[in-house]
């Protein structure tokens, strides 16, 4: 079997006047993430991991932040389009593991919703999708609450490989 592993990363600045959307879940908080789309840092990291595993570049290659078509885009729609593109290239997703690093707000109450959204968008059973939440122990820009970061790993199998 032809296994492929991809790694994804994203970070966005926290600002006032934007909703905070992570893993497709709108989280009550006084600030949200700045970005061209909805700035869903977790879904962007997962999308990058998937494109990377399939050697199809990255999220910016497919959904440019300079393209007006993606202004305010729902990252769940972008993730589903990513899945369609990697499936068309002959890959199937085996699992995704991810980590969100945020000093605040507390993300644990929202993890189940994030996992459910991601599993649905990837067409995977829930037990093949993991989301972890960590703080940065008050260190650096993440620890000061200036932004939120996400990392992801994905395993794909090339069909017929």
Curated annotation (Swiss-Prot):
Keywords: Isoprene biosynthesis, Lyase, Metal-binding. Pathway: Isoprenoid biosynthesis; isopentenyl diphosphate biosynthesis via DXP pathway; isopentenyl diphosphate from 1-deoxy-D-xylulose 5-phosphate: step 4/6. Its cofactor is a divalent metal cation. GO terms for molecular function: 2-C-methyl-D-erythritol 2,4-cyclodiphosphate synthase activity; metal ion binding. Pfam families: YgbB. InterPro entries: MECDP_synthase, MECDP_synthase_CS, MECDP_synthase_sf. The keyword Nucleotide-binding does not apply. Involved in the biosynthesis of isopentenyl diphosphate (IPP) and dimethylallyl diphosphate (DMAPP), two major building blocks of isoprenoid compounds. Catalyzes the conversion of 4-diphosphocytidyl-2-C-methyl-D-erythritol 2-phosphate (CDP-ME2P) to 2-C-methyl-D-erythritol 2,4-cyclodiphosphate (ME-CPP) with a corresponding release of cytidine 5-monophosphate (CMP). Homotrimer. This is 2-C-methyl-D-erythritol 2,4-cyclodiphosphate synthase.
């Amino acid at each position: 079997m032809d296994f492929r592993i991809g790694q994804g990363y994203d970070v966005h600045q926290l600002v006032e006047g934007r909703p905070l959307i992570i893993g497709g879940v709108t989280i009550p908080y006084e600030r949200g993430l700045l970005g061209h789309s909805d700035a869903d840092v977790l879904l962007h990291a997962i999308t990058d991991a998937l494109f990377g595993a399939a050697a199809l570049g990255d999220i910016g290659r497919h959904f440019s932040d300079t393209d007006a078509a993606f202004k305010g885009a729902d990252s769940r729609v972008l993730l589903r389009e990513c899945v369609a593109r990697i499936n068309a290239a002959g890959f199937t997703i085996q699992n995704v593991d991810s980590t969100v690093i945020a000093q605040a707000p507390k993300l644990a109450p929202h993890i189940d919703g994030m996992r459910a959204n991601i599993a649905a968008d990837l067409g995977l059973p829930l037990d093949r999708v993991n989301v972890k939440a960590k703080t940065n122990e008050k260190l650096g820009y993440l620890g000061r609450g200036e932004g939120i970061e996400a990392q992801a790993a994905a395993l794909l199998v090339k069909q017929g490989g």
